Amino acid sequence: MEELILGIVQGLTEFLPISSSGHLAIFTAIFNSTPDVGYFAFLHLATFLAVLIFVKSEVFEIVNGISKKDNEYINLASKLVLSTIPAVIVGLCFGDFIESVFSSTFLIGVFLSITGILMLLSDKLNQNLKTIKSIPYLDAMIVGIFQAFSVLPGISRSGTTLFAALFLGMKKEDAVKYSFLMGLPVTFGAGILELQKVSFSAEQLFGFVISFLTGLLGLYLVKKMVIGGKLKIFGYYCFLASFFVLMFL
């Protein structure tokens, strides 16, 4: 039952800007069990597949453009790679510290508050000038730096990258696409690195499937909420979750 619940939590919260890692750690604390970082990473592979399906047309365009040596798509792919570098460096260099943070409900509560603030601010950003193809390399690096902070449980990956992209003047729909696309290698890498720690029990595999299905639902919801200018709803939720964690866990 625990694996099923964690699968649902991972699928829904991976793309909603409320921090999937933070919620997995919270529910683990509620279950009074030891955080299984390996299983958490395994669930990331499920949501990786979900987002790959969700942005399959964009991925196909990029791959097709690169094969035809189209500079526009080569530059876009280069920017996406650049955006992933900070998170990769942080994950490799500070993996043990990050794993220890999963056991600190106090820090998770604080980080959820930070995510909440970013979501409230995001709704006020409406420059809507740049597309995923037109953003400069510097912007790609800045968005990547924001993503690097999301290795901490409670800091939302989609939340930080959406905030950064919108702050830098990207159109809302393009900000969503860029956030999902740049998250593909990070999410895949996180799952692969910890795969050897997974026992592949029937319960864990079922949790994987559930995480994939609920991930598709989460992707639809976040796209609709960003375009509709309703990110503040997630901000209020993060504040409530933070209060609950700090007061009761």
Curated annotation (Swiss-Prot):
Its main location: membrane. It is a multi-pass membrane protein. It is found in: Cell membrane. The chain crosses the membrane at residues 11-31, 35-55, 80-100, 101-121, 135-155, 175-195, 202-222, 226-246. Its EC number is 3.6.1.27. It catalyses: di-trans,octa-cis-undecaprenyl diphosphate + H2O = di-trans,octa-cis-undecaprenyl phosphate + phosphate + H(+). Keywords: Cell membrane, Hydrolase, Membrane, Transmembrane, Transmembrane helix. This is Undecaprenyl-diphosphatase. It holds the Pfam family BacA. It comes from Methanococcus maripaludis (strain C5 / ATCC BAA-1333). One of its GO terms (cellular component) is plasma membrane. Catalyzes the dephosphorylation of undecaprenyl diphosphate (UPP). The keyword Transmembrane helix applies. It comes from the Archaea. The keyword Nucleotide-binding does not apply. GO terms for molecular function: undecaprenyl-diphosphatase activity.
